[in-house]
Amino acid sequence: MIIWIASYPKSGNTWIRSLLSSYLFSESGKFSFELLKNIERFSIKIDKANIKVKSNYQTEISKNWIPSQIKINRDKKIRFFKTHNAMCAINGNKFTDKQNTLATIYIIRDPRNLVTSLAHHYQLNINDAFNFLTNKRKIIFPINSNYKNKKELKP
């Protein structure tokens, strides 16, 4: 079964994964970046066999959310996964369900700190970061996309 570590980007997901991985996967309790591999991003585990090679569309990927989780859960082991996905459905495809989820750790960060973190991470000014976060038509980190140009983040 899956335990989700869910958050909006720049909210402390990696920090929580660092604490959990040090506690759960280290004999000494000491942190190393190698330990973070024990709590992967869910998007890495999505079964992409049925997705067109050049597809960047969340709709196509969302069709594989539940089937991928069913496949992951076949051995009945408890696994942690990082996600920035919302508990949503895209074209009727739910992100997860009770049959595949054991628990969720939901991380919430003060939005004022989130704005400054996003601005610093993407080298934006505070106003551009705020406008990006409050734009209802924007998403962060679409699957299969890498932001190499901060202009892509501009509102």
Model-identified regions with their sequence ranges:
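PAPS-dependent sulfotransferase catalytic domain
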Residues: 1-155
